Amino acid sequence: MKCPFCGAEDTAVADTRLNDEADVVRRRRKCNACDKRFTTYERAEIQLPQVVKKNGLRTEFSRAKLRASLELALRKRPVSIESVDAAVADIEERLLSAGEREVTTQQLGELVMRELKKLDKVAYIRFASVYRNFEDVDAFSRAIREVSPAAKKK
């Protein structure tokens, strides 16, 4: 590890600690050239799949885009930031556990809809109306029946 103060590559680890979640390692280091101390944080690099768009283009998975999609559907709805964070983490975990190198935007959309259905039915309908390209009232009615407990009992 290069010293950020003098640029020397001769450094030693003085202390190592795991954070509470055990996903980050904090290391206190000491430069053997200038005797200054500094802290580094280490995290395992997670490789999320490439996103294949409808037109065939491939892009990097974007946590920010995923979060923005959820937040847009949940705008002005009584859902906590923590719940949104958990939904994003759940979607990422599903993508990682699938072990695929690529995921289609359709697959991502279905994962988002699954999370929104659990979080807020109105947000689910909002997202579904755009994602599934609802063109008439019947499409909305079908989606509402899908999430309405009263409609399922009949």
Curated annotation (Swiss-Prot):
GO terms for molecular function: ATP binding; DNA binding; zinc ion binding. A zinc finger (unnamed) spans 3-34. Residues 49-139 form the ATP-cone domain. Transmembrane segments: none annotated. Binds 1 zinc ion. GO terms for biological process: negative regulation of DNA-templated transcription. Its cofactor is Zn(2+). InterPro entries: ATP-cone_dom (IPR005144), NrdR-like_N (IPR055173), RNR_NrdR-like (IPR003796). Keywords: ATP-binding, DNA-binding, Metal-binding, Nucleotide-binding, Repressor, Transcription, Transcription regulation, Zinc, Zinc-finger. Negatively regulates transcription of bacterial ribonucleotide reductase nrd genes and operons by binding to NrdR-boxes. Belongs to the NrdR family. This is Transcriptional repressor NrdR. The gene is nrdR.
